[in-house]
Amino acid sequence: MSSDSEMAIFGEAAPFLRKSEKERIEAQNKPFDAKTSVFVVDPKESYVKAIVQSREGGKVTAKTEAGATVTVKEDQVFSMNPPKYDKIEDMAMMTHLHEPAVLYNLKERYAAWMIYTYSGLFCVTVNPYKWLPVYNPEVVTAYRGKKRQEAPPHIFSISDNAYQFMLTDRENQSILITGESGAGKTVNTKRVIQYFATIAVTGEKKKEEPASGKMQGTLEDQIISANPLLEAFGNAKTVRNDNSSRFGKFIRIHFGATGKLASADIETYLLEKSRVTFQLKAERSYHIFYQILSNKKPELIEMLLITTNPYDFAFVSQGEITVPSIDDQEELMATDSAVDILGFTADEKVAIYKLTGAVMHYGNMKFKQKQREEQAEPDGTEVADKAAYLTSLNSADLLKSLCYPRVKVGNEFVTKGQTVQQVYNAVGALAKAIYEKMFLWMVTRINQQLDTKQPRQYFIGVLDIAGFEIFDFNSLEQLCINFTNEKLQQFFNHHMFVLEQEEYKKEGIEWEFIDFGMDLAACIELIEKPMGIFSILEEECMFPKATDTSFKNKLYEQHLGKSNNFQKPKPAKGKPEAHFSLVHYAGTVDYNIAGWLDKNKDPLNETVVGLYQKSAMKTLAFLFSGAQTAEAEGGGGKKGGKKKGSSFQTVSALFRENLNKLMTNLRSTHPHFVRCIIPNETKTPGAMEHELVLHQLRCNGVLEGIRICRKGFPSRILYADFKQRYKVLNASAIPEGQFIDSKKASEKLLGSIEIDHTQYKFGHTKVFFKAGLLGTLEEMRDEKLAQLITRTQAICRGFLMRVEFRKMMERRESIFCIQYNIRAFMNVKHWPWMKLYFKIKPLLKSAETEKEMANMKEEFEKTKEELAKTEAKRKELEEKMVTLMQEKNDLQLQVQAEADALADAEERCDQLIKTKIQLEAKIKEVTERAEDEEEINAELTAKKRKLEDECSELKKDIDDLELTLAKVEKEKHATENKVKNLTEEMAGLDETIAKLTKEKKALQEAHQQTLDDLQMEEDKVNTLTKAKTKLEQQVDDLEGSLEQEKKLCMDLERAKRKLEGDLKLAQESTMDTENDKQQLNEKLKKKEFEMSNLQGKIEDEQALAIQLQKKIKELQARIEELEEEIEAERASRAKAEKQRSDLSRELEEISERLEEAGGATSAQIEMNKKREAEFQKMRRDLEESTLQHEATAAALRKKHADSVAELGEQIDSLQRVKQKLEKEKSELKMEINDLASNMETVSKAKANFEKMCRTLEDQLSEIKTKEEEQQRLINELSAQKARLHTESGEFSRQLDEKDAMVSQLSRGKQAFTQQIEELKRQLEEETKAKSTLAHALQSARHDCDLLREQYEEEQEAKAELQRGMSKANSEVAQWRTKYETDAIQRTEELEEAKKKLAQRLQDAEEHVEAVNSKCASLEKTKQRLQNEVEDLMIDVERSNAACIALDKKQRNFDKVLAEWKQKYEETQAELEASQKESRSLSTELFKVKNAYEESLDHLETLKRENKNLQQEISDLTEQIAEGGKHIHELEKVKKQLDHEKSELQTSLEEAEASLEHEEGKILRIQLELNQVKSEIDRKIAEKDEELDQLKRNHLRVVESMQSTLDAEIRSRNDALRIKKKMEGDLNEMEIQLNHANRQAAEALRNLRNTQGILKDTQLHLDDAIRGQDDLKEQLAMVERRANLMQAEVEELRASLERTERGRKMAEQELLDASERVQLLHTQNTSLINTKKKLETDISQIQGEMEDIVQEARNAEEKAKKAITDAAMMAEELKKEQDTSAHLERMKKNMEQTVKDLQLRLDEAEQLALKGGKKQIQKLEARVRELESEVESEQKHNVEAVKGLRKHERRVKELTYQTEEDRKNILRLQDLVDKLQTKVKAYKRQAEEAEEQSNVNLAKFRKLQHELEEAKERADIAESQVNKLRVKSREVHTKVISEE
């Protein structure tokens, strides 16, 4: 897997798994100096890379990568590995194996996102804190079946290796995943389960119970679904990890014999239940609380009576309440579905949620202190009512039990007062207990569901448990976790080096075995030995007055100074107090023992527990049904008798028991180790903190593994690789030119090198090196290579320079040659013949090209003709191919059916032989078991008699006890005075009891010694059995070879059938592709027809668009002409205005001068007055005329602007229509192109089919020849069939029945398939409707967005207009001020203007005439434009109608497309159904034929064997039934004895109650006695527990013996008797123990009337004595059993002889079987030959069929693409139509607003005119304002400014010509007269203009009326659109609700 091409199977995950070839080559070629490249110790980074600069006196000076120079000791410098080891996948292969090398290898791989790395047997994984594509399905398939060295490191590789080892080695496997919280343990566990669920699927769904209504999935789904449920209730956010598992789990995945998933189960460890009631600030409680509060399922909020605010609940809101990386709503749905998939009932599901809600309510319960008392009382009952409702309890009883719990004092129950803090503690303990028990119950229920009862043979266990923990504050939880890791590390060390040393042994290397597992034994024994930490903790928990201090003192007494691993911690500032330290393999840990005793006892409020047991909620009652309360002990003896010992089981004892089970499971498996690492505390991807990672490597045991690895030979290389790599060190040692073995070459090479020869060893295939030696060899190799390379470089450089010199010489000669030729050319360049040559040369080439073009045209015509001929031939060949394919399919079906029948017959024959052998073996086993059962029955009857004798003796003892009790009654009255003395005696009795316990422990040790002796005897038996197994091994080998031959035959037959089936499927697929091709051709023709129609429509639309474009262009040209005319009009008007202003200024100047100069005579004054009056009159007339003219011009200008704007909008709408049509045209062109490409692909497919046809014809001829051979075989088989036909009558009848069943099933299947197809069709219709509605919604949203954008644009345009208006107003004001200031200065200009006034007046008249003519022409153009606008409106309506028609046609086209698509899908579904049906029918037919042939072959032999077997089985079943009855009777006796014992116990407790009733007067003494009694009860419980422990020990012995017995039964020996006898001994001991208990109970029943205190002590003393006697009896019985074992060894020897005889018989049977095998072998050889021929034919056909299927698929995909493109085009067309309609409406609205504004503007102008008439007196000021307005329109006219400046200069000149002006006054009068006449003319023109404006106003009103009607139509259309949108929303909501 080294090349990039081989890594391609991993897809996009390849760069995240292994370096590319380029990177590897670059790494090997990197410069590297092995002597100077090192790692040095750094206080910040732990280790850094550096270059050694000098070494002096044990000190090393080095320069780090950062540029710093450091000096360190020699032992703080570590050599760096060569570059070829960079990012190495297995760190155990590194040359220098130490901490910095491991650290930097992990760091560099992590930087390249390669998160998995091997370290020997470990797989180390670093949390990437981001998603990587390394878990995709393609990666799963890539790792399947790959060996570890063939694929990059990965959790899938570990999983697959475990799976393959399980299948090949037939051994259970385990995967141990450890690491700190947040390191990725849970994710890797999920990936392991995902991998197994993917590669080992069963494919069968669990049977669903119709009554239960569970939504169960497959086993794989349930295994995967168990994770979300466990994570919801067992995972929480911590400081380091958002999804931290707060419990350990061991998931066992069971597999069947074939490797398929069979079942699974889960074991959990150390759930952190304290998190239920308390969390740190940065953490939160378990996910389930926040999932429920997320309100994803509102029904839960109502059911649990809670709110959605986590801060309303105290237990869950102490820290964080949300996690960014977790969606609680989605997780709730996943949890809820997991509960359903895992098969929880509805009641159980409700109970889970209710109990979770009750825990939240418990946190809100409030209590307060009573006044003047310490007693607590409830502070409100509302929360308690909710909690009680959810737990189906009475609220008052719950509060009473919490505040006033009942305590058993003596024989009475007394209510005890509780403080507020005690009540809160009790509530928290109950909440934690409910949650813990519910979690454990859920795990049990999951295990029940995952247990499918399918046969299971092996399992793979996945252990996800917390890694080693070293915190500042370490408590009991940390001790448990660290102890678990210590045991796991010991297990790893032992396993790792057992394998390592086995390899040494296999390679033939001398090695002394070292058990590295013993390295950790001292710490483990310190914790778990009899007087270890856990033992002392449990002992202290039994004493009522024990404290943490007493516990610490006992620890110091036992271990301080005696064990090196137990130390007294040194006090550290700023850290919590530590009481003792333990030296673990990962470091020294300081432990604080505060509260350990309470944690270990785990007390609960027994009164509330009693309420829970009586709860109406079955689940809650079941959870606490196992809890033993004081009331249950006092009242219910029957229930309390069985679990009295287990009720006081401590947390540590339960933990040790679970840990021992786990280690037992792991020891029985082959383990695989995964270590998870946290790279940094900040969850930053790609960053790595050195100190943190090193700490985890130590805690995870990675560095421990490296330490042990260095003691051996960690580096090893194959001989061939070593020879190739290190041959350069001494090439002369290996002779050239002759063959030499790689091993010998390596030995010679190493012998010739100067190294320490004790540091390496030679194995059979590899050379092994001690750590560091390989690095030395690498340094030597580098030095040698450096010498060789320098020498090679010198040679190469000399050679290259010589080559360069030769080139330079050749270049010199070439230059001389070129110079000579150029000089010659320069001489002949002007020669006339050479010029002629230059001209003719190009003409020759053009003639040649014309000839080539002519030839190419001829060839083109020929190819056209050939193409037509080939098309005709192709059609003929296609028709022939169809007929030939049908014939070929028929023939192949016949051949396949006959071959299958033959193969199945042979397979059935082999299976019958196997079943016969198995049945014979089972018969032997059953007979042996029956004999053993008879012996056991005899032994049990004897033991029963002995027990009856012992019962009679015990009755005598009871009589003696009754006499003593009578004496005790007499002494009753004196007991009151002796109470104090008795308490002292009780203390003495305690001491005696302690002595008895010590004696009992000594007896237990002796018992353990006897068990060890027994184990030794069993070992001896095992050695004997090994000798026997060796003899039987030969038989097994022969049988194995026979089985292999049979398997080979079966495999060949299966492969043959598979190939034939594939051939048949390929033929069917070819037929399907032919049908698909025909359908596609038909669709293509229809498409072409539709496309031709669409093309015609497109051409029509294009013609219409061209016409519209022409009209638009004409209108635009006309608009441009009008604009030019307007501009000319404006210029002329400005010119006239300027002239008028000049004249007015000149008149004013003249008048002023006349006033100044005209004072000479009164006549002149009067003249001046008259002239001035006339002048004023003329000015007024002129101003009125100019005002009217300006008003009319403004009106005309506005109307023209309106018409231009309307035309512009119409042009815009037409352009939009044009763009829309062009878009449709482009889309249709794209569709045509797609269809053309589809046609091309179809034509290519046709060509391929022709090619296939030819090949198939050739194959058909070959198949025909093969068919003849098959026909010959068929004839032979038919002859055999005829011979066997006489015996097939009965089987033919069975066959008919099966056929009937098959037909019935097929009919049912057809009905079901029809239903399925109908449902699929409905689903597709619903999805289509949904998609259309989604598209409609999308288009509506798009319309809305467009409207919003247009509205914003209009608003912006409006704002711009307003800004323009304001700007214009400001400019008007500026001009007004300017002209007001300039008017004062213009008096001087009038004198200059006098001369030119006449000329200018004349020009003004001409200009007015021109203006009038232009006004008339404008009116005409306006009329013409209005007509054209109306025509354009008509055209627009036509185009809209055409668009609507196109829309309708498009919809019809969409409908046709949808119908064809639906038909295609229906035919496809029918085709698939028919294919499936045909396959199932063919398989059923094959099965029936196989059964028929099998019955023909072995009918007689089966009948005979069946009769014999039935007889033997009936005999054996009778014997077994008798044995079972006898055992059942014994069990009944045992149950009866247990019942009697429980009755005695109740009588004892009644006696105690009566005694305590009489002592009620003395309460203080009674309490003391109760304490004493409770201690004795505890000791009795301890004794009962010890007895139970003895029972468990005996049961373990029995189980181990049972396992050995089963193995011996399989190997046909008689060792079963040993186990049965031991079981008998065990039953005898149990019966004796039960008898003793019954006698004790009867004695206690007789003591009911005793009332004295001595009775209690006497009873316990008697119990202790009896326990001692029982132990002595058991010891004697064990000794007797050891003697019996010696006798049974002798029996085993006899059984060995019997097995020898059996072996000889088996050899005889083997000879018979070998003869049969020979016959079958001959038949197989002939079949194999035929099979090989068929395989070659099938492989050819299969390859060709794959090509055909691929081409058909491509054609189908393109057709689908065309359909989807058409649908998209239709949708886009619809969207464009909607947008155009919307824009049309917007346009009309804007037109209306423009017209409104125009009206307002006209009204304002009219008001201004009216106001002007009223203010005639202020005409002069008004003239200036109008002049400023006129000037504002010509602000950009530069000529006016220049003219003004010239006029100013002229005015200055006119001051000198005043006399000439006086002479011209008469002439001016004449001019005034003329002006008056012209003013009258102007008035007439103004009236005419007013009439025209009235006409235009009428037209405007008409247009406005039409606009209002259009607006109404738009409103109606908009209301219809809104209705459609409402309907679409209703349909959408219905679709969503239905989904």
UniProtKB/Swiss-Prot annotation:
Keyword Coiled coil: yes
Phosphotyrosine PTM sites in chain numbering: 389, 424, 1464, 1492
Positions contributing to ATP binding: 179-186
SMART domains, A to Z: MYSc
UniProt modified residues of type Phosphothreonine: 64, 69, 391, 419, 776, 1241, 1255, 1265, 1286, 1467, 1501, 1517, 1730, 1736
GO CC term, one of those recorded: cytoplasm
Notes on the domains: The rodlike tail sequence is highly repetitive, showing cycles of a 28-residue repeat pattern composed of 4 heptapeptides, characteristic for alpha-helical coiled coils. Limited proteolysis of myosin heavy chain produces 1 light meromyosin (LMM) and 1 heavy meromyosin (HMM). HMM can be further cleaved into 2 globular subfragments (S1) and 1 rod-shaped subfragment (S2).
Functional note: Muscle contraction.
Name of the protein in its database record: Myosin-4
Organism: Homo sapiens (Human)
Gene encoding the protein: MYH4
